[in-house]
């Protein structure tokens, strides 16, 4: 399955000057919501991701996503895996588990995002779940921006990666684009970064 073509066909691979939720600036932005607005494609992508996870023979009892960007991807992945789905969300800028969602002690959970850049949001979600006694067994995403190490990828983890190295990250594709710290972004010389993404927007 050509994941890059899926993003291009859905007009979800945007070019410009963007402020990513990780804080980095980039000339490309992946808008997964445009890909996931097609239920059949969302189901197909989730099944592809679930296949990778099932081949790893992991015991997963639940999928959890940080709102809002990860919700559609996480729900479809949970459906493909046949497990329940919950999500965390920010309240006053603090990641929280609410809406009656509960986790059991030692419940084995996969944290799923639509896109993994540094993994910061996924780790905020992880912290909430672990504080409630859950056991995080893996991470998943439709796409990986190449900072974190993905299972089945030759790319190594880069500076800024937040995900723990001892847990697998399953994703369908690496999208490696230039990313810049705000204080050294060459794009800022000619334009202002816009934020089309999820965190704080």
UniProtKB/Swiss-Prot annotation:
* A biological process from GO: 'de novo' UMP biosynthetic process
Report keywords, A-Z: Glycosyltransferase, Magnesium, Pyrimidine biosynthesis, Transferase
Which InterPro entries has this protein been placed in?
OPRT, Orotate_PRibTrfase_bac, PRibTrfase_dom, PRTase-like
Per UniProt, 5-phospho-alpha-D-ribose 1-diphosphate binds at: 113-121
Associated pathway: Pyrimidine metabolism; UMP biosynthesis via de novo pathway; UMP from orotate: step 1/2
Reaction(s) this enzyme catalyzes, per UniProt: orotidine 5'-phosphate + diphosphate = orotate + 5-phospho-alpha-D-ribose 1-diphosphate
- Supply the CDD domains for this chain: PRTases_typeI (cd06223)
Keyword Glycosyltransferase in record: yes
Pfam families found in the cross-reference section: Pribosyltran (PF00156)
Q: Which GO terms describe its molecular function?
A: magnesium ion binding; orotate phosphoribosyltransferase activity
EC number annotated for this UniProt entry: 2.4.2.10
Q: Which cofactor does it need?
A: Mg(2+)
Chain residues that bind orotate: 117, 145
The similarity annotation says: Belongs to the purine/pyrimidine phosphoribosyltransferase family. PyrE subfamily.
> What's the subunit arrangement here?
Homodimer.
Q: What does this protein do?
A: Catalyzes the transfer of a ribosyl phosphate group from 5-phosphoribose 1-diphosphate to orotate, leading to the formation of orotidine monophosphate (OMP).
Family annotation (NCBIfam families): pyrE_Therm (TIGR01367)
This chain's protein is named Orotate phosphoribosyltransferase
Gene (name only): pyrE
């Amino acid at each position: 399955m050509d994941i890059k073509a899926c993003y291009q066909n859905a007009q979800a691979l945007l070019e410009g000057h963007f402020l990513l939720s990780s804080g980095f600036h980039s000339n490309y932005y992946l808008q997964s919501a445009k890909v996931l607005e097609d239920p059949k494609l969302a189901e197909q992508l989730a099944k592809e991701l679930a296949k990778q996870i099932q081949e790893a023979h992991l015991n997963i009892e639940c999928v959890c996503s940080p709102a809002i960007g990860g919700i559609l991807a996480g729900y479809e992945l949970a459906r493909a895996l046949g497990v329940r789905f919950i999500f965390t969300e920010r309240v006053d800028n603090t990641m929280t588990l609410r809406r009656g969602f509960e986790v059991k002690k030692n419940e084995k959970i996969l944290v799923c995002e639509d896109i993994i850049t540094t993994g910061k949001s996924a780790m905020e979600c992880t912290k909430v779940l672990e504080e409630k006694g859950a056991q995080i067994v893996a991470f998943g995403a439709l796409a990986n921006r190449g900072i974190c190490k993905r299972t089945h990828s030759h790319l190594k983890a880069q500076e800024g990666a937040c995900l723990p190295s001892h847990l697998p990250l399953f994703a369908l594709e690496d999208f490696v684009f230039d990313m810049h710290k705000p204080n050294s972004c060459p794009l800022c010389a000619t334009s202002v970064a816009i934020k089309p993404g999820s965190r704080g927007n």
